[in-house]
Regions:
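Compact nucleic-acid interaction/catalytic patches
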Residues: 3, 17-22, 26-56
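Non-catalytic surface loops within mature trypsin-like serine protease
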Residues: 13, 44, 63-65
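Short coil-to-beta transition motif at edge beta-strands of beta-rich domains
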Residues: 1-12
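C-terminal terminal-subdomain/extension
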Residues: 53-73
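Generic N-terminal initiation segments characterized by hydrophobic and/or small/turn-forming residues
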Residues: 8, 39, 63-67
């Protein structure tokens, strides 16, 4: 896993207005020693039916939340 990779990430449980559930996320920082990553969740735009960053909502999560690798940008 490295910066720019896109994975499905399990963001549950969500609190308040956080995006939850299984989401495509892009990794923006890797903290290897702590087994943590900083990600930006993506969501589907109903107008274009494509994945977008609707709003920047960075989260730091455990690497154990990573599920399926999608691609690297």
């Amino acid at each position: 896993m490295k910066k720019g990779d896109i994975y499905y990430v399990d963001l549950s449980p969500a609190v308040g207005n956080e995006l939850g559930g299984m989401r495509m996320c892009q990794i923006v920082e890797v903290y290897a020693e702590e087994n943590l990553i900083r990600v930006i969740p993506m969501t589907r735009d109903p107008k274009t039916n494509s994945y977008v960053f609707r709003e920047i909502h960075e989260r730091t999560v455990s690497t154990k939340r990573l599920k399926e690798f999608i691609k690297n940008y």
